Curated annotation (Swiss-Prot):
Protein name, per record: UvrABC system protein C
Domain GIY-YIG: 14-91
Cytoplasm found in the keyword field: yes
A GO molecular-function descriptor: DNA binding
Domain UVR, first and last residues per copy: 196-231
Entry GO terms, CC: cytoplasm; excinuclease repair complex
Protein family: Belongs to the UvrC family.
GO BP term, example: nucleotide-excision repair
Localization in the cell: Cytoplasm
Keywords annotated in UniProt: Cytoplasm, DNA damage, DNA excision, DNA repair, Excision nuclease, SOS response
Gene name for this UniProt entry: uvrC
Xref: Pfam families: GIY-YIG (PF01541), HHH_5 (PF14520), UVR (PF02151), UvrC_RNaseH (PF22920), UvrC_RNaseH_dom (PF08459)
UniProt lineage: Bacteria, Bacillati, Bacillota, Bacilli, Lactobacillales
Length: 598
């Protein structure tokens, strides 16, 4: 804890409000709310915490707070601050969690369409459906039963669907409002589960068609009846009152929370939403934050009722969700919340079981790798790869795997400083010497195994640096790729030999992941350097364009091509004078002409 934080902790009020934790860059990394700011914020810097909270606290170098009049106001502010700043340690709802709806449009000749976007007063919406496949299946069934407008043909023209009896042409179908009202009511009844009358009508038509020997038409009616029956069986009835409601349950364990939401429409369970995330606040408060974010997403349909668990404050939920909030006390409704909670517990336990299985699998891979190489268990592995194009912008990268998992905070990038031209051996020598001379000098944690991307030559260079130049005793291995650029051989020993490694073993998959990761990291860094060098060389020697303005252009436009496509006004909007903008554009044009000339 630094002096700034110590001082600020003394000034915290005993009031409700929001607090914003910041990292060394001044970026907001966590937003929370509290009934008592003094107690809550101080709790982060006192006593012991679980690992994930310790990680959060280790990044905090400053914080701000905003005092509010009430806990409700603090909750609303917290939700807005999270939406605005998207802090990395706050709850993040899954992307694209909008569900499909069926919509009857408000047009003169209404159409039945599928949409994921709800607009107020823009038509009638039915759903949501669990996925686009289900929504399409229901729509196909409705299209065959109800002749909505399907085409955009002009008056006096009919379309293909009209001949199938699935579309009404402008001048042929009824134009009076009463007809459309009846059709829409029929659809509403059908989607609300009141489809007995429709089935009776279809059955009558099927029998009539059979009597007329129109067996194909009778078969169509039979298939429609079968389709309705299938749709019924896919929906589990959860309540007899046919009400639309969302049912929330949650469970917490080991610093993680799982929230389950049952979407019940017309008494039927049509879908559930599952979200698992680490929480850093009180469980009840983080659950409220989740609910606020959930319904702030405009694509989430707000039902007539929302059921919540007993521990949650009804008034706070009512402040963020504009519908009837119910905390069931007994009977069927309480059982529904209990069922959602039970499912949350099961989902969380499944996560822990899978995690434990993955840990055992990875731990076994590391152990087996150590036995194969006859070294201590390689808990920490550091892997290296070079990247350049014909010697230009040469770079190298190091990735670190701890207990078989990437430790991205330990990754390092290297610009090659002493090598001229494409010399992978010399580049590897420079990078390894820079890395491990520092490890030796500063007493940094050394790896249990070093892996270099390459064959015998690269491994021998690495061993020469580690053993002879630096006098270290760290095992060095090499990973060779085949002609398809895939992990193929593990080289190790003295003399170097190919280690027999079963292709389907966990240790092979681990090495494959390491090699892919270091290659990805090196290539990505090389692209960044190459782009920056290209960017800088093009913009060098322009009067009035110093390092800060070049950096500004690079951050905003990313590439020279993007600058060339931008207007003068767009570049000037960054605060760059018009005369400098004109010089930039002229320089880019001149460079282009130079390249195109013979």
């Amino acid at each position: 804890m630094n002096e700034l934080i110590k001082h600020k902790l003394e000034l915290l009020p005993d009031s409700p409000g929001c607090y914003l934790h910041k990292d060394k860059e001044g970026t907001i990394i966590y937003v929370g709310k509290a009934k008592n700011l003094k107690k809550r914020v101080r709790s982060y810097f006192r006593g012991s915490h679980d690992t994930k909270t310790e990680l959060l606290v280790s990044e905090i170098v400053d914080f701000e707070y905003i005092v509010t009049e009430s806990d409700t106001e603090a909750l609303l502010l917290e939700i807005n601050l999270i939406q605005k700043n998207m802090p990395k340690y706050n709850i993040k709802l899954k992307d694209d969690k909008s569900y499909p709806f069926l919509k009857i449009t408000n047009e003169s000749f209404p159409r039945l369409v599928i949409t994921r976007y709800i607009k107020k007063n823009d038509g009638l919406y039915f759903g949501p459906y669990p996925d686009s496949y289900t929504a399409n299946e229901v729509k196909k069934l409705l299209d065959r039963i109800f002749p909505f407008k399907k085409c955009k043909n002009p008056i006096n023209k009919v379309c293909f669907y009209y001949h199938l009896g699935q579309c009404c042409a402008h001048t042929i179908c009824h134009t009076d409002k009463a007809y459309w009202d009846r059709l829409i009511d029929d659809v509403k009844h059908f989607l609300n589960g009141k489809d007995d009358k429709i089935i009776e009508d279809l059955r009558s038509k099927m029998l009539a068609a059979s009597e007329e020997m129109a067996f194909e038409r009778a078969a169509e009616y039979r298939d429609l009846i079968s389709g309705i029956a299938t749709m019924r069986t896919k929906q589990r009835v959860m309540s007899k009152d046919l009400q639309d409601r969302d049912i929330f349950g949650y469970y917490v364990d080991k610093g993680w929370m799982c929230v389950q939401v049952f979407f019940v429409r017309q008494g039927k369970l049509i879908q559930r939403d599952v979200n698992l995330f680490p929480y850093y606040n009180d469980a009840e408060e983080d659950f409220l934050t989740y609910m606020g974010q959930f319904y702030q997403d405009k694509q989430h349909f707000i039902p007539k009722e929302v059921f919540i668990p007993e521990a949650i404050d009804e008034e706070l939920v009512a402040a963020i969700v504009p519908t009837k909030i119910i905390k069931p006390k007994r009977g069927e409704k309480k059982q529904l919340v209990a069922l959602a909670t039970k499912n949350a517990r099961v989902s969380l336990q499944q996560k822990f079981d899978l995690l434990e299985k993955d840990i055992k699998k990875t731990s076994g891979a590391i152990e087996n790798l150590g036995q194969l190489l006859k070294i201590d268990k390689p808990v920490r592995i550091e892997a290296f790869d070079n990247s350049n194009i014909q010697g230009t912008s040469p770079v190298a990268a190091m990735v670190v795997f701890v207990d078989g998992k990437p430790s991205k905070k330990d990754y390092r990038k290297f610009k090659i400083k002493t090598v001229v031209g494409p010399d992978d051996y010399a580049s590897m020598r420079e990078v390894l010497f820079r890395r491990y001379s520092r490890v030796k000098k500063e007493g940094l944690q050394a790896p249990n195994l070093i892996i270099v991307d390459g064959g015998v030559g690269q491994v021998n260079v690495a061993k020469d640096v580690i053993e002879k130049q630096l006098g270290l005793t760290i095992p060095v291995a090499g990973l060779q790729k085949n002609d398809k650029h895939q992990t193929h051989d593990l080289l190790f020993g003295n003399p170097l030999e190919v280690v027999p490694l079963p292709r389907r073993s966990e240790e092979f998959f681990l090495l494959h992941r390491i090699q892919d990761e270091v290659h990805r990291f090196a290539v990505t860094f090389h692209r960044q350097v190459r782009r920056k060098n290209s960017f800088s060389s093009t913009l060098d020697h322009i009067s009035g364009l110093g390092p800060k303005r070049k950096q500004l252009l690079l951050r905003h436009f990313k590439t020279i091509t993007a600058i060339a496509s931008a207007t003068s006004e767009e570049i000037q909007a960054l605060g760059i004078p018009k005369t400098v903008v004109e010089a930039i554009q002229q320089q880019i044009t001149d460079n282009k002409n130079d390249r195109s000339s013979p």
